[in-house]
Amino acid sequence: MELRAIKTGKLIIFGRECDMEKKTALIIGASRGLGFALVQEYLARGWQVVATVREKSGSALHELAERSSGDLEVERLDITDTNQMLILKRRLQNRRFDLLFVNAGVANDRYETIGEVATEEFIRVMVTNALSPMRVVENFELNVVANGTIGVMSSGQGSVADNEKGGFEVYRASKAALNTLMRSFAARHSQDKRSLLLIAPGWVKTEMGGPDARYSIEESIPRVVDTITAQANTSGLQYLDQFGKVVRW
């Protein structure tokens, strides 16, 4: 068998050009908005991606997979469903990824105070934004290679130090809880050489961010991916914005 590398990053096998091994990403929560854009950006940069949505079929991600020439695989996962998470964990148990990135976020009314929010709504936001992303990290961290990256989509509103204007009280609390849980994970894995990231993408024009947000998805997500890429092979936990600047805890 003829097998040789050439400068273009290709292999010649039986006279055919083949891509050398691509980097791989597992992106959780990619049905729309920031998560979907992350998948698009990594595909555009030549990665192979496994991404999750809640739907069995018919989503924009499924349609993207059909056009991806095999570089995108779609798996089903409701991030709050522990049974689905365990099923996916078994399905992917022998897979290894350079990047695990978890994107999840819901919000209640921005002006609803902690004294007004219903208990059920408080639980919904906390479970979706804090508990469930960390359950993903706990269940899939062994799928990430030794020099890989584990990232979670946080928010600048998760910063306790920067909370000077109020508003979004429950959402802020949920992202602050996420940050604290990720920090506890990092403390338990202090000898881990992988990069651990909390990413604040900025106020982005999404369904949740609204039309008046400062940044478009097309502005934010390439910067987010640049920031993730720049931190590769940098061990320990960092809380960074889309520009790679440190966010105060």
Locate each region found by the language model:
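Conserved glycine-rich Rossmann-like NAD(P)H-binding loop of the short-chain dehydrogenase/reductase
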Residues: R45-L61
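C-terminal helical subdomain
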Residues: Q191, L198-I199, G210-W249
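Conserved N-terminal Rossmann-fold NAD(P)-binding element of oxidoreductases
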Residues: A25-G29
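Conserved Rossmann-fold cofactor-binding substructure of NAD(P)-dependent oxidoreductases
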Residues: I79-R95
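Rossmann-fold cofactor-recognition segment
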Residues: R67-N83
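N-terminal Rossmann NAD(P)H-binding glycine-rich loop of SDR-like oxidoreductase domains
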Residues: S31, G35-Q40
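Catalytic loop of short-chain dehydrogenase/reductase
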Residues: V106, R110-M126, M134, L142, ...
